[in-house]
Amino acid sequence: MPLFFGRKRENRADSCEDPVLTALLGSRTVTREMALQVPTVAGGIDLIANLVAGTPIRLYKDTPGAKATEVTNDYRLRLLNDETGDTLNANEFWKAMVRDYYLGKGGYAYINRQGGKVVALHYVEERRITVLKGTDPIFKDFDLAVDGYRYKPYDFLKVLRNTTDGAAGVPLTCESANLIETAYAAQVFEKNMVRRGGNKKGFLKSEKRLDKDSLNELRRGFARLYSADGEGSDNFVLLNNGIDFKESSNTSVELQLNENKLTNAGEFAKLFHVSPDCISGKASEQDVASIARLAAIPLMTTIQCALNKDLLLEREKGQFYFAFDTKELLRGDMKTRFAAYKTALDANFMQIDEVRYAEDMEPLGLDWIRLGLQDVLYNPKTHELFTPNTGTSQQMGQLSLIHI
C-alpha cells in the first residue's frame, strides 16, 4: 500500500475560495459573507440551524430481538445537549456547525479526550482547517491541520455536505455560486438606487467642448446629486446653456427587481428543500412538517453518522448509537395526532397507556384491550375460533362447538 503522508506526497485540498485558482479561472469568488447578505440564504440556514440545535440527542443501546433501550446516564449526552466543555454552549455549538456545513467545507469540532474519555467538544472555524490529502484515489486518507498543528481524522467530529472523500464538503458558495452572486448583485443594485435618492443614471450632451474647470464643476455637482448625504440647497445641478441631460433608461430592470427577488427566493428555497413561505414566516402546518422531513432530518442523519463514527468507542459500535429525538418534530398538530390515536385505539393496535406515553402523560395502569361483542377472535397458531358474544370456541374445520 502506498505511503500517503510522505513529505513529497502531501497535498492540500483544492478550495473554491483559493485566490490563485479563482484568478486562473477568471471568476469572482462568492464568499460566505456575500451569501449571508442575501436574506433568503441567511434565513434558510438560520431556520434549519434552529431546528437542529433545538432537537435533543439521545443514546440508545440496541439489543438483538428486543426494543432498543435509551441510555440516560452517559457523560457524552451532556456535551451534546448542554455544555460542550468549550466557550460555546450546545445550542451555539450546533448553530455554528450548521452554518459551516452550508457555507464552508464542513463543520469541524475537536474531540478533547483524556484517557479515552471525551471531556469536551471544541468548535473550530472551518476556515482555520487545512485538509492534507493523500493522492491515492482508492485508499483515501488525510490529515487535518489547524494553524500548522497536524491532527488525525479521528481527532475531529466532521459534519460534511456532499463530500466525496470524508475530509471536506462542498459549500453552497461553490455549488450555487451564480445564484448567490445574482441575488447579491440585485441587493447592491437596489442599495445604489437608494443611495442616489431615486435619481436616474444618464449622460450629458454638450453643443460645444467644455474646458477642464467646467467638467470638474459638473462632476462635483452630479456627485452631490447622487450622494445620499446631499440635501437642501446642495442637492442640485445647474446646467449651462447648450448642455442637456439624457436619461439612460433601465425601467424594465427596475420594474422586474421585485419579481426577480421573489424568483430567486424560490430558487434558494429549493436548495434548502423548504417552502418559500417557511422562510418568509407564512408557513402552514403542512409546510412546517415538511421542513422537518425534507430539510432538518436529513441533516440530523448526517450528524448522527458522524457522532456514531467519531464519539463511540470501537467496542460500542454496533451496540450503541446516537440519534436525534425527532418525535416532537413529527408529531403534527393536536387535531391530527388525536385523530390518529382514535384510529389506533379503535383498531386495537394501541392501548390507552401507550397513547398517554406518546403524549408524555402519566400511565393509568390499564393493561386490558377493548373488544366488541360482535368480534370473532381467531388464533392462527392453534386454529381456534372464539366468539365473545356467545362465549364459545371451536377449531377451524370442525362443526361441533365447545362451550366455555
Task: Give the label of every model feature segment.
Residues A289-A295:
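Small-residue-rich helix-loop
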Residues M1-L257, L262, E267, L271-V274, ...:
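Structured, contiguous alpha/beta core segments that scaffold functional sites
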Residues N199-F203, R337-A340, Q351:
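A general alpha-helix detector
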Residues T87-E92, A96-G106, V131-K133, L257, ...:
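Divalent metal-cofactor coordination and adjacent catalytic microenvironments
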Residues V253, D287-V288:
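Short beta-alpha connecting loops at secondary-structure transitions
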Residues A283-E285, F320-E328, A358-E362:
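Small/polar glycine-rich anion-binding or flexible loop at a beta-alpha turn
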Residues N235-L238, D277-Q286, N308-G318:
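Short acidic alpha-helical/loop segments enriched in Asp/Glu that coordinate divalent cations
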